[in-house]
C-alpha cells in the first residue's frame, strides 16, 4: 500500500508539473501576442485616414536613425496580388512618399507581372506611373492615354483610408511566431467574409475566390519600434504552390533620406 501511495504521489506531482509548465508556455504565447498587437496598434489605430495629408502634421516613431532636424517621411503602400492556377502573378498597387520637411508627396502606381520558368528562375516585368499628391488628390506627372488605367489611378484608395482596426485587441487565439535572432514576428487570425475589412476589399477588387482570408500581422526589427524595421498587414485568401491571392498594406515612418523617390 505504501508503494502504491508513493506512485500516486509521484504521478500527481508529474501531472501538476506538466500543467504548470503548460500554463507558463501559454502565458508566454499570450504575452507575445499582446506585444505584437500593441506594436501594430500604434499604426493601425490611425486607420481610417480620410485625408492622407493629415500625416504631414503627425509624427511616427523616432530613433537614433533620424537627424535632429529631420521631420521624417511617411511611406504608404497598398497592393493586391493575384496568381490564378497556371498563370503569372499580377500585382497592382500604389506607393506614396510623404515628406514632412517639404510637405510634398510623390509616388507611383505600379503593375508587375511575375513569372517562373521550368528551371525555377523568376522574371519580373514592372511598369510605373509617376504622380504627385495635392489637396488629397492624385495628379499624374504626365498625361495618361489609357482611360482604364487613368480611372484606376484616379479612384485608387489606400487600405489605410478605409481599413478599420478599432477592434484589433478583440482578435483571439492567434497563431503567433517570434524569432529573436532576426528579429521577426507575426500573428495570424482567421477572418470571416462578414468582417468589415474583408467586405471593403471585395467591393474594391475582383477577388477570384470565395474563401475567407487570414489576417497576418508581420514585421521585423524591434517590437517596441524601429525606423529600419518593417511592418505589414496582409489579408491572405489563398497561398499555395499553384495559386496565390493576397493583399498587402503598410504605413511606415522613416528618416527622409531612406526613400526610393
From Swiss-Prot:
Q: Where in the cell is it found?
A: Cell membrane
Q: What is its main location?
A: membrane
Q: Which cellular component, as a GO term, is one annotated location?
A: plasma membrane
Q: Which UniProt keywords apply?
A: Cell membrane, Lipoprotein, Membrane, Palmitate, Signal
Q: Which InterPro entries match?
A: Csa, Csa_sf
Highest taxon, organism lineage: Bacteria
N-palmitoyl cysteine lipid attachment residues: 23
The record, for Pfam families, names: DUF576 (PF04507)
In the UniProt record, the signal sequence range is 1-22
Q: Where is the lipid attached (S-diacylglycerol cysteine)?
A: 23
Q: How does it sit in the membrane?
A: Lipid-anchor
Kindly give the PROSITE patterns that the UniProt entry links to this protein.
Answer: PROKAR_LIPOPROTEIN
The record, for NCBIfam families, names: SA_tandem_lipo
- Record family assignment: Belongs to the staphylococcal tandem lipoprotein family.
Please give the name of this protein.
Answer: Uncharacterized lipoprotein SE_0186/SE_0187
- Give the source species: Staphylococcus epidermidis (strain ATCC 12228 / FDA PCI 1200)
Amino acid at each position: 500500500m505504501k508503494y502504491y501511495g508513493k506512485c500516486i504521489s509521484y504521478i500527481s506531482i508529474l501531472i501538476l508539473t506538466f500543467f504548470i509548465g503548460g500554463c507558463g508556455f501559454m502565458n508566454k504565447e499570450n504575452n507575445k501576442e499582446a506585444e505584437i498587437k500593441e506594436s501594430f496598434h500604434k499604426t493601425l489605430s490611425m486607420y481610417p485616414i480620410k485625408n492622407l495629408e493629415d500625416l504631414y502634421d503627425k509624427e511616427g516613431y523616432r530613433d537614433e536613425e533620424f537627424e535632429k532636424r529631420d521631420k521624417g517621411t511617411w511611406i504608404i503602400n497598398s497592393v493586391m496580388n493575384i496568381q490564378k492556377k497556371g498563370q503569372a502573378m499580377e500585382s497592382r498597387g500604389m506607393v506614396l512618399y510623404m515628406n514632412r520637411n517639404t510637405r510634398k508627396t510623390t509616388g507611383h502606381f505600379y503593375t508587375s507581372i511575375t513569372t517562373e520558368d521550368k528551371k525555377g528562375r523568376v522574371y519580373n516585368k514592372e511598369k510605373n506611373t509617376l504622380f504627385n499628391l495635392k489637396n488629397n488628390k492624385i495628379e499624374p506627372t504626365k498625361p495618361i492615354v489609357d482611360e482604364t488605367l487613368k480611372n484606376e489611378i484616379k479612384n485608387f484608395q489606400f487600405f489605410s483610408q478605409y481599413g478599420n482596426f478599432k477592434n484589433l485587441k478583440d482578435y483571439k487565439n492567434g497563431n503567433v511566431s517570434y524569432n529573436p535572432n532576426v528579429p521577426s514576428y507575426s500573428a495570424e487570425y482567421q477572418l470571416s467574409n462578414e468582417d468589415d475589412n474583408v467586405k471593403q476589399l471585395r467591393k474594391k477588387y475582383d477577388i477570384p475566390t470565395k474563401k475567407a482570408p487570414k489576417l497576418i500581422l508581420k514585421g521585423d526589427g524591434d517590437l517596441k519600434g524601429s525606423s529600419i524595421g518593417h511592418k505589414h498587414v496582409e489579408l491572405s485568401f489563398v497561398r499555395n504552390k499553384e495559386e496565390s491571392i493576397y493583399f498587402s498594406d503598410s504605413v511606415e515612418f522613416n528618416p527622409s533620406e531612406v526613400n526610393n523617390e
